[in-house]
A protein has these predicted regions:
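Transmembrane alpha-helices of multi-pass inner-membrane enzymes
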Residues: 57-60, 170-174, 373-433
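Alpha-helical transmembrane segments of multi-pass inner-membrane proteins
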Residues: 111-113, 122-150, 155-226, 357
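Transmembrane signal-anchor hairpin modules in multi-pass inner-membrane enzymes, especially those
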Residues: 1-90, 96, 100, 114-129, ...
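Hydrophobic transmembrane alpha-helices and their immediate junctions
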Residues: 120, 338-381, 416
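Helix-loop-helix junctions and helix-breaking kinks within/between transmembrane helices
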Residues: 44-53, 98-103, 156-159, 189-228, ...
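Hydrophobic transmembrane alpha-helices of multi-pass, membrane-embedded glycosylation machinery
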Residues: 56-63, 107-111, 209-221, 352, ...
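A membrane-periplasm/extracellular boundary helix in multi-pass inner-membrane enzymes
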Residues: 198, 202, 220-270, 288-292, ...
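Long extracytoplasmic/lumenal interhelical loops at the membrane interface
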Residues: 270-284, 288, 296-339
Length: 433
């Protein structure tokens, strides 16, 4: 309670006007367990994964029916998240593979809806804690795959595995740094964090290792520097503007040195080449496919299908078995091929909305949770240029992006009710109610 005015009554007592708050509901442990299982399903492949996912979706739809008065207003506030999935669902009308397109369209539409339902029932602190528990379980599930981790472990490709374990490592590090976390969860995070790093090293993905370094440094700086800086008026804004200025000056210097190939030098230091491990060839094929229907695209599931000769040519070029469902390793190209320039515009709008909310939440509340959400969002954004995970359904990067952008829309928080008079009686040296 915050006392705002004091009304004296006699020498030893007084009336005060106090702010009254309503505490949020306590979230049952069984709900937290279910949501942890949902996140685990997106972290790592499980036995009976598809039936489990459909059962969980039915539970979410049941929650939607029970709490539609809370869910629908948040859906309306988060409308940029739904425009692309809606257009994708409409694209089944011109997709050459309608059956597969209907399934994918439903999953794309359910992905942001489930995120809204989760944020309606849980606060962001509980969500991140459940994601951490899911990450712990994912590490346990991955232990039997230790020898096959260099080729992907439980995943068909190593970079998928490395990126999932990357988020486990960052969630563990965030929990370890967070003084508000339960003591035993911080101890568990201290055990899981190095194990996650070892698993990442077993799957030699240069991208994931770079993201891990950036994320760890970012969380460390927020914890021990940014939160102290935020206590000084306007200092954060000054540092932010100075940082942007330094970045722009550095970019100008690099761009003016045309005789230097910094990208090739950087990739060489990571053991990569300028084709990004063959991705440039796939990007060229994707650009050709996008030109077939530049405005509305091929429709969902219109390219990566065993019956599509162009897709199988890419498999052959990439030394993959016939029928392998690859990606273009670029989320924007993926959207452009399947949904054209209209879909690409809606995708960029979604990113603009998510980025704006993540930044505004961070500047208004520089807590470790909000800072971690900004770091996660930045990692997912950068990954869109070399991976297609941010153009998919029900995966960890999208969960972190959507839930991070929706964090402050959660109704599960302490709410201001009003003011009430409170009578206080005091003894010499102290006051008591």
């Amino acid at each position: 309670m915050n006392i705002v005015s004091r009304i004296p009554t006699d020498r030893d007592s007084s009336l005060v006007m106090a702010k009254v708050y309503e505490e949020p509901r306590k979230i049952p442990y069984w709900e937290q367990a279910l949501i942890s299982v949902w996140f685990l399903n997106s972290f790592v492949p499980l036995p009976l994964e598809t039936p489990l996912r459909y059962l969980m979706v039915l539970w979410f739809l049941w929650l939607l029916a029970l709490h539609k008065e809370q869910v629908i207003p948040i859906v309306l506030k988060a409308w940029p998240l739904f425009l692309l999935p809606i257009f994708g669902f409409i694209s089944i009308l011109w997709s050459p593979y309608m059956g597969a397109a209907i399934r994918s369209g439903a999953l794309y539409l359910l992905t942001p809806l489930v995120a809204v339902i989760i944020i309606t029932r849980f606060d962001i602190t509980t969500i991140l804690r459940c994601m951490f528990f899911a990450g712990v379980m994912a590490i346990i599930v991955c232990i039997p795959f230790y020898d096959s981790m260099p080729s992907g472990g439980p995943y068909p490709q190593k970079h998928y595995f490395a990126q999932q374990i990357l988020f486990v490592a960052l969630l563990s590090f965030m929990t370890l740094l967070n003084e508000k976390s339960w003591p035993w969860t911080r101890l568990l995070a201290a055990l899981i964090f190095p194990v996650a790093l070892i698993f990442m090293l077993r799957a030699p993905s240069a991208t994931a290792l770079v993201f891990a370094g950036v994320g760890i440094i970012g969380l460390f700086l927020v914890k021990f520097a940014w939160q102290s800086i935020s206590k000084v008026r306007h200092l954060r804004s000054i540092i932010f503007i100075a940082g942007v200025s330094v970045f722009l000056i550095g970019a100008m210097i690099v761009l003016n040195q045309t005789h230097q190939d910094y990208v090739a030098d950087f990739l060489g230091a990571l053991g990569k080449d300028t084709t990004f491990t063959g991705r440039t060839h796939i990007w060229s094929a994707g650009r050709l496919a996008a030109e077939e229907h530049p405005i509305i695209g091929l429709g969902l599931e219109g390219f990566w299908n065993p019956s599509n000769g162009a897709a199988q040519s890419i498999n052959e070029m990439d030394f993959k078995p016939y029928g392998t469902k690859l990606t273009f390793h670029n989320a924007y190209l993926e959207v452009r091929v399947h949904l054209g320039y209209i879909g690409l515009g809606l995708y960029l709008l979604m990113w603009a909305w998510c980025g704006y909310r993540l930044l505004m939440q961070f500047f208004r509340d520089s807590s470790l949770e909000m800072s971690a959400l900004l770091v996660f969002g930045a990692i997912v954004f950068i990954s869109t240029f070399t991976e297609s995970l941010a153009w998919a359904s029900f995966n960890t990067p999208l969960n972190l992006l959507y839930l991070g952008a929706l964090a402050t829309l959660s109704p599960v928080r302490r709410t201001y009710v009003g003011k009430a008079p409170v009578y206080l009686s005091s003894s010499p040296g102290y006051a008591k109610a």
